[in-house]
């Protein structure tokens, strides 16, 4: 298995939402690199198709509620902390950027649950009740891949 180059800093808070096989990369736009990335995308897609073929409907209400809340928690995180939001805001204005993020990119923020960002992540609360806009409250980020080739977490103490 070939590992793509790590794409730069990712906060430890964001890391909890990703698996060890996440594609988080930046590389030179060469034909070979595009082929490698496209091949990885196809591999992901094939596995996704296999998983959806094997999926069965979950009838355990507790599991359904837990899964829905986990998805809502992720969408709520991304809608609030999406690193592309400042660029979108400059391009299309704050109101349109917010709509794009919450109604398209991370649709489900308003329909899957009613908890707010601060309900899930109270450590981001400011004294006035607003959300602290810092990307990381823990202060750790990973500039290098925090997992080895087998998926073992190796990030630990050397996070910067």
Residue ranges and their predicted role:
Residues 1-83:
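Mixed-charge (acidic/basic) macromolecular-recognition segments
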Residues 61-160:
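Alpha-helical oligomerization segments
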